[in-house]
């Protein structure tokens, strides 16, 4: 335990993320942090603060966030020193200007009690667990909707029933959304990536771009009419050729400059009015068996000669590494140092002498 506590105390000693107004949280006994629970930290926080969750084998639980803050973990892959990561339940949002990054969590949802338009919410570099509805606003019946939500760099791998739960649920009250650079495993047969629709009459209220969507079975991209989405520069790896990209009722939705491939046979271009790269294997740098199931050790970058290079919108690459966002498999927030090793400085330590250690870390992106 002392080894783990040492790593936890060092977690916040380096880098810009540990500037003023950082509230550290650890739910382990005798842990050197300011707060022992997420609820306690949220109660003490002020607008603009960073609530930093230290790695722990214990779940931090659900939380309702009512002030503009950042909830930050050290990434969604186990810390090499403590063997843990920050895991939480569902974040219920009742305020604008919220950022959730670098944690392992169940969902971010818009609270039904949110009485105004909730703007500028960022969900970045997280990994999601559970059945789905990982980012959801459409089931909140009394709120006024959302604007300028950004969902980037996340890993979404449903691992629980029911298998009809969508990955995202949005509503006609949501506008100016961007869902981009996410790894999405559409695992279940009746699961949809997008459920719901943007504002009636507002074309392309939702941008869905530079994502990698892997489907484990047959299904459809959306079960909504009037989705009002612009889907570009994505990489779709589809197991079943019967997969439906766009239901006939989905108006104002476009598929532009995507790569769509199935190893089982040819797919039909869902939007003949635009160019999509159809039925050409994407060719990744390092993916086991060429099938892009999620693995933290895989490299989902496009290999030289891939048909997806330069074929995204405006000449970008399709998939996770096109455009300007820097996707990383471990979900480490930009600028946050990460520890790689710790060792004693000397092989022999005299009796009653202090123990000196050497710590190595990456300085962050």
Language-model features, listed with the residues they occupy:
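C-terminal accessory segments
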Residues: 274-333
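Bacterial Sec-dependent N-terminal signal peptides
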Residues: 1-22
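Predominantly extracellular beta-rich ligand-binding scaffolds that present long acidic/polar faces
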Residues: 66, 112-115, 156, 162-296
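Short, compositionally biased P/S/T/A/G/V-rich stretches that sit at domain boundaries
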Residues: 318-355, 360-364
């Amino acid at each position: 335990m002392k080894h783990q506590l040492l790593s936890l105390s060092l977690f916040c000693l380096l880098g810009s993320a540990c500037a003023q107004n950082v509230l550290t949280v650890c739910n382990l006994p005798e842990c050197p942090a300011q707060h022992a629970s997420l609820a306690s930290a949220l109660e003490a926080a002020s607008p603009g603060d960073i609530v930093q969750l230290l790695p722990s084998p214990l779940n931090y639980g659900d939380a309702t966030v009512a002030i503009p803050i950042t909830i930050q973990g050290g990434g969604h892959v186990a810390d090499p020193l403590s063997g843990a990561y920050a895991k939480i339940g569902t974040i219920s949002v009742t305020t604008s200007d919220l950022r959730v990054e670098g944690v392992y969590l169940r969902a971010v949802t818009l609270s039904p009690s949110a009485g105004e338009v909730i703007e500028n919410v960022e969900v970045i570099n997280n990994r999601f667990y559970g059945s789905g509805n990982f980012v959801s606003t459409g089931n909140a019946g009394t709120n006024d909707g959302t604007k300028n939500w950004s969902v980037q760099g996340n890993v979404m791998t449903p691992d629980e029933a029911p298998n009809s739960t969508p990955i995202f649920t949005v509503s006609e009250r949501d506008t100016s959304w961007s869902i981009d650079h996410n790894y999405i495993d559409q695992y279940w047969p009746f699961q949809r990536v997008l459920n719901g629709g943007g504002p009636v009459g507002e074309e392309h209220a939702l941008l869905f771009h530079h994502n990698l969507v892997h489907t484990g079975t047959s299904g459809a991209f959306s079960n909504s009419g009037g989705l009002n989405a612009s889907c570009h520069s994505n990489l779709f790896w589809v197991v079943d050729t019967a997969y439906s990209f766009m239901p006939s009722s989905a108006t104002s939705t476009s598929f532009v400059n995507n790569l769509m491939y199935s190893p089982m046979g040819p797919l039909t271009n869902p939007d003949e009015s635009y160019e999509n790269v159809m039925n050409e294997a994407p060719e990744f740098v390092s993916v086991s068996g060429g099938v892009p199931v999620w693995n933290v050790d895989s490299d989902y970058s496009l290999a030289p000669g891939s048909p997806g290079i330069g074929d995204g919108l405006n000449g970008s690459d399709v998939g996770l590494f096109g455009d300007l966002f820097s996707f990383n498999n471990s979900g480490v927030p930009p600028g946050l140092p990460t520890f790689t090793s710790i060792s004693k400085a000397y092989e022999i330590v005299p009796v009653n002498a202090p123990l000196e250690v050497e710590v190595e870390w990456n300085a962050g992106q």
